A protein has these predicted regions:
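Bacterial N-terminal signal peptides
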Residues: 6-16
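Signal peptide-proximal N-terminal region
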Residues: 62-78
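Active-site-proximal C-terminal subdomain of hydrolase catalytic domains
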Residues: 41, 84, 166-207
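Caspase-like (clan CD) cysteine peptidase catalytic core
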Residues: 19, 23, 27, 34, ...
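Positively charged n-region of N-terminal signal peptides that target proteins for export
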Residues: 1-4
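Glycine- and acidic-residue-enriched helix-capping/strand-helix junction motifs
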Residues: 46-61, 65
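Short, solvent-exposed loop/turn elements at domain surfaces
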Residues: 45-52, 76, 140-141
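Short beta->alpha junction loops
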Residues: 80-89
């Protein structure tokens, strides 16, 4: 299933990338926009209580390679923050987010790709969702996970305030291990990830 999702992504972005110059040549001549990407893939977590995933790290590497290829837009390697397994701590993820916000400008394109575990808390009525980083503990993921509310705020700030195009791609597996319940977990995580504004593209596979 994960391979099918990855294949769909590569096919989709190949079409989008190839078609863009044709759509833009008619009316708009401007400086070439830059592309930045945060690509995260975590298969092996620090906390042994968090189940391992088989292909998340490899999927992230494949996506980063695609972005650097001609069909993916020839994105310079220095414009891609690739965070795999133990490198993908909450601190490094936040650092990468700030790096993008400090560098992107109007009409740029920003990719945020995450493949790994997603989870939601079941204490509040909001059922807030989180993306689980490498060093996020299973017993305190609310404090050391990447809040989807925070991620949505970042994405909206870049798309609305900076006026850059943002593409959010998440392949987040919800196991229910950290909350003790699988009930509607993938629905809530996926629903929160799909709250988008103008100038944003979002794709989520939540299982």
């Amino acid at each position: 299933m994960k391979y099918l999702f990855s294949l769909f992504l590569l096919s989709f972005f190949y079409v989008v990338t190839v078609a863009q110059p044709l759509a833009g040549n008619e009316t708009h001549v401007a400086s070439t926009p830059d592309t930045y990407a945060i690509v995260i893939g975590i298969s092996d977590y620090k906390d042994p209580d968090i189940p391992k995933l088989s292909f998340s790290n490899r999927d992230a590497e494949v996506f980063a390679d695609f972005l650097m290829s001609a069909p993916g837009g020839n994105v310079p390697k220095q414009h891609i923050k690739l965070l795999i397994d133990s490198v993908a701590t909450i601190g490094e993820v936040d650092k990468a987010i700030r790096w993008v916000m400090n560098n992107c400008k109007e009409d740029d394109k920003v990719y945020f790709y995450f493949s790994g575990h997603g989870e939601m808390e079941n204490v509040t009525m909001s059922k807030n969702g989180y993306l689980i980083c490498y060093n996020t503990p299973s017993v305190a993921f609310v404090n050391m996970g990447l809040s989807i509310d925070y991620l949505n705020d970042i994405v909206n700030t870049i798309s609305v305030q900076t006026k850059a195009k943002v593409i959010v791609i998440t392949d987040a597996c919800h196991s229910g291990t950290m909350t003790g319940s699988k009930f509607k977990g993938n629905f809530f995580v996926g629903e929160q990830l799909m709250l988008k504004k103008k100038n944003e593209i979002r794709m989520a596979s939540c299982k």
